């Protein structure tokens, strides 16, 4: 079946770059940069829809659910990138935020032919994760019409999971296939059809907001400090110390002493210093308040 892509914004020609092959290198880059500046504004226009998705993901996390990204090509890789950053940044289990890409692991590094056109493949991928109604499935595709993503959203709807779509065309099948549609319209690409450019940047900004927003809402940020960060390397060990110093105002030595007393758990160390509790008391208090430092501090 022939697919008419000409009506898609993401496939149309951009008059601003029509002669880009004749420009100097600096002029060429200036055109790209000027077009990139439109991306943040396109994302700003859909903030209310992003907020709906953040609240849905936060609710899912609080009720044993997961966040599952689905995409093909660049969109799938962006989902995997965002998912992979959550454990080291927020101390989450690897299975809490998952990225699926059409074609599996091979497709992360190189294209897998016809994988994105297979709806059944998406259903099988979700079945392998034992998808439940508590989960949130986020379909990502610049065009808004990728069969793999549509198949995943359809199966997720059947199971009763919350569905979200992220696309860069204002009218597309994915908008109708999800409960929450996030559609940052960034306009035609500098290189016609190269949706890894503005569309990919918009998708990355939205994904940043989804996970960051949900983690903040889940108590994993205190002030603007990532208080669930795990000490998996030398840089993060030092970051833990800096976080405790910033959160409490104590010196680095006192912060390090508190961290050592609680197996390097930032939240516990912060609560110990600010409340005068010992490590076990602080851990218990945090558990009583689902890991929210502010709530634990306010419980006198």
Curated annotation (Swiss-Prot):
Pathway: Amino-sugar metabolism; 1,6-anhydro-N-acetylmuramate degradation; Amino-sugar metabolism; N-acetylmuramate degradation; Cell wall biogenesis; peptidoglycan recycling. One of its GO terms (biological process) is amino sugar catabolic process. It comes from the Bacteria. GO terms for molecular function: carbohydrate derivative binding; carbon-oxygen lyase activity; ether hydrolase activity. Keywords: Carbohydrate metabolism, Lyase. The active site is at 85 (proton donor), 116. Residues 57-220 form the SIS domain. Its EC number is 4.2.1.126. It catalyses: N-acetyl-D-muramate 6-phosphate + H2O = N-acetyl-D-glucosamine 6-phosphate + (R)-lactate. It is an enzyme of class 4 (lyase). It holds the Pfam family GKRP_SIS_N. PANTHER family: GLUCOKINASE REGULATORY PROTEIN. Specifically catalyzes the cleavage of the D-lactyl ether substituent of MurNAc 6-phosphate, producing GlcNAc 6-phosphate and D-lactate. Together with AnmK, is also required for the utilization of anhydro-N-acetylmuramic acid (anhMurNAc) either imported from the medium or derived from its own cell wall murein, and thus plays a role in cell wall recycling. A lyase-type mechanism (elimination/hydration) is suggested for the cleavage of the lactyl ether bond of MurNAc 6-phosphate, with the formation of an alpha,beta-unsaturated aldehyde intermediate with (E)-stereochemistry, followed by the syn addition of water to give product. Homodimer. Belongs to the GCKR-like family. MurNAc-6-P etherase subfamily. This is N-acetylmuramic acid 6-phosphate etherase. It comes from Vibrio vulnificus (strain YJ016). The lineage of its organism: Bacteria, Pseudomonadati, Pseudomonadota, Gammaproteobacteria, Vibrionales.
């Amino acid at each position: 079946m022939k697919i008419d892509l000409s009506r898609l914004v993401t496939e149309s020609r951009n008059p601003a770059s029509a002669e880009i092959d004749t420009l100097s290198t600096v002029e060429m880059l200036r055109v790209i940069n000027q077009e990139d500046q439109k991306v943040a504004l396109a994302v700003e226009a859909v903030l209310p829809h992003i907020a709906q998705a953040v609240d849905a993901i936060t609710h899912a996390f609080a009720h044993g659910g997961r966040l599952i990204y689905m995409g093909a090509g660049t969109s799938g890789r962006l989902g995997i990138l965002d998912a992979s950053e959550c454990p080291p940044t927020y101390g989450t289990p690897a299975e809490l935020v998952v990225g699926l890409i059409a074609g599996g692991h091979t497709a992360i590094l190189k294209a897998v032919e016809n994988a994105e056109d297979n709806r059944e493949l998406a259903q099988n991928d979700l079945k392998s994760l034992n998808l439940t109604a508590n989960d949130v499935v986020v379909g990502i595709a610049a065009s808004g019409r990728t069969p793999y993503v549509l198949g995943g959203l359809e199966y997720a709807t059947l199971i009763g999971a919350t569905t979200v779509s992220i696309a860069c065309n204002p009218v597309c099948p994915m908008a109708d296939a999800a409960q929450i549609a996030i559609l940052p319209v960034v306009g035609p690409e500098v290189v016609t059809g190269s949706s890894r450019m503005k569309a990919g940047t918009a998708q990355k900004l939205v994904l940043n907001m989804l996970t960051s927003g949900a983690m903040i809402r889940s108590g994993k940020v205190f002030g603007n400090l990532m208080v669930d960060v795990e000490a998996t390397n030398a840089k993060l060990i030092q970051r833990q110390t800096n976080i405790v110093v910033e959160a409490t105002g104590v010196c680095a030595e006192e912060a390090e002493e508190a961290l050592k007393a609680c197996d390097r758990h930032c939240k516990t160390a912060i609560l110990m210093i600010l409340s005068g509790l010992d490590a076990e008391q602080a851990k218990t208090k945090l558990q009583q308040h689902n890991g929210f430092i502010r709530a634990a501090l306010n419980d006198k």
